Regions:
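Central antiparallel beta-sheet cores of small beta-barrel/beta-sandwich binding domains
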Residues: 25-196
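Bacterial Sec-dependent N-terminal signal peptides
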Residues: 1-27
Length: 196
């Protein structure tokens, strides 16, 4: 109904402001905390290459190395059957906060952290390569604790985890690659033709 549509539009605008409103100082303290929990156990789906091959990314282990750097371990799966373990790092370089906190029964988000990543696959040399690019990750405050943002309303089409970049094979072949928890970024306009 109309009320629900207006509610969804308002929520969308609030999320849009999140990405735009950068805070100056109090949020800098957040970056000093251990943010491992924001990355741990993430499962995302994405696309690899011009032909938009499906890729699944699962982060299995996270460890804080220094104030802004985290060691990451996980697995990638392409063609639904080729599984490669990977390890690497994420570096957090900035933070934004929502101009208004979003707290409801289904959605909790205080802002996003941003940075870059580099993950090297190991295992079968024919299939392994290196992922690199930039990311954003939603967070929420729970008392003094920082936790993953939460969204249970699929209609919002809101990514709480989003990675954009490239994959470079051991032989030097480079492919565009992006993945997320909800809506895959950078999909071509005719994406549905690939995936019908």
């Amino acid at each position: 109904n109309m009320k629900q549509k207006i509610y969804h539009i308002i929520i969308f605008l609030l999320f849009w402001f999140c990405g735009v409103a950068y805070s100056q100082n109090p949020k800098a303290d957040i970056l000093q905390q251990d943010l491992s929990g924001l990355f741990d156990n993430l499962s995302m789906i994405g696309i690899l290459g011009e032909d938009c091959s499906r890729i699944d990314i699962h982060i299995t282990e996270v460890r804080k190395m220094d104030s802004r750097e985290y060691e990451i371990k996980g697995i990638s799966r392409t063609r639904l059957s080729v599984i490669c373990p990977f390890k690497g790092k994420v570096c957090v370089d900035s933070i934004s906060s929502c101009s208004q906190m979003i707290k409801s029964e289904y959605t909790e988000l205080d802002g996003f952290i941003y940075g870059y990543y580099s993950f090297a696959e190991y295992g079968d040399k024919r299939y392994s390569g290196t992922f690199s690019g930039s990311f954003k990750q939603g967070y929420r405050m729970s008392g003094q604790q920082i936790e993953k943002g939460r969204n249970e309303i699929a209609e919002l089409k809101l990514n709480l985890s989003e990675y954009r970049g490239k994959w470079k094979s051991a032989k030097g072949l480079t492919k565009v690659c992006s993945w997320a928890d909800e809506i895959i970024p950078d999909t071509p306009a005719n994406f549905c033709l690939f995936n019908d």
